[in-house]
């Protein structure tokens, strides 16, 4: 079934109308070549969870991170289909504090709550793990600020 669909796509991609409206066909590779070209896209390197966490902690721990890089990192992290580990969030909150960007700290915590979705036990766990950092940096949660009622 997949081979037939790939062959149809390959033929459609190599057929064009000439100047008189006649259909012309370029020589198409066989079905094995078409399937092989699709499979080549999945041969990228795979990052382990530990490498992923280390990459993001390192990113947010850069001493010269600026506000644009911070927001870009937060936006990229939020697009992933996961709730970041508390150590990544800790590093991001510390970067926000270095830049005196309180709004981003609230945004990060709101994003974590949103990413947890229907799993109501995830957000309290993350806040529990981050509580020492939140207290140290003087950061209030959205609930403490009353933003959850707005």
Curated annotation (Swiss-Prot):
> What UniProt keywords are attached to this protein's entry?
Acetylation, Heme, Iron, Membrane, Metal-binding, Mitochondrion, Mitochondrion inner membrane, Phosphoprotein, Transit peptide, Ubl conjugation
Q: List modified residues, type Phosphothreonine.
A: 141
**Record's bilayer topology term:** Peripheral membrane protein
Give the matching CDD domains. Cyt_c_Oxidase_Va (cd00923)
User: According to the UniProt entry, where does the motif SIFI-degron sit in this chain?
Assistant: 2-20
Recorded hits in PANTHER family, A to Z, give: CYTOCHROME C OXIDASE POLYPEPTIDE, CYTOCHROME C OXIDASE SUBUNIT 5A, MITOCHONDRIAL
Q: Which family does it belong to?
A: Belongs to the cytochrome c oxidase subunit 5A family.
Name under which the protein is recorded? Cytochrome c oxidase subunit 5A, mitochondrial
Taxonomic source organism: Macaca mulatta (Rhesus macaque)
Read off the lineage from the record: Eukaryota, Metazoa, Chordata, Craniata, Vertebrata
């Amino acid at each position: 079934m997949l081979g037939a669909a790939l062959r149809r796509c390959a033929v459609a991609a190599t057929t064009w109308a000439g100047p008189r409206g006649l259909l012309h066909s370029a020589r198409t590779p066989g079905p094995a070549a078409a399937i092989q070209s699709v499979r080549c896209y999945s041969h990228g390197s795979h990052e382990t969870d530990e490498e992923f966490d280390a990459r993001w902690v390192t990113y947010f721990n850069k001493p010269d991170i600026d506000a644009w890089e911070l927001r870009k990192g937060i936006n990229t992290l939020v697009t992933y289909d996961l709730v970041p580990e508390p150590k990544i969030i800790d590093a991001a909150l510390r970067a926000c504090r270095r830049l005196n960007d309180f709004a981003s700290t609230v945004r990060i915590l709101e994003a974590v709550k949103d990413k947890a979705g229907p799993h109501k036990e995830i957000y309290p766990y993350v806040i529990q793990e981050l509580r020492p950092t939140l207290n140290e940096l003087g950061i209030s949660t959205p609930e403490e600020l009353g933003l959850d009622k707005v």
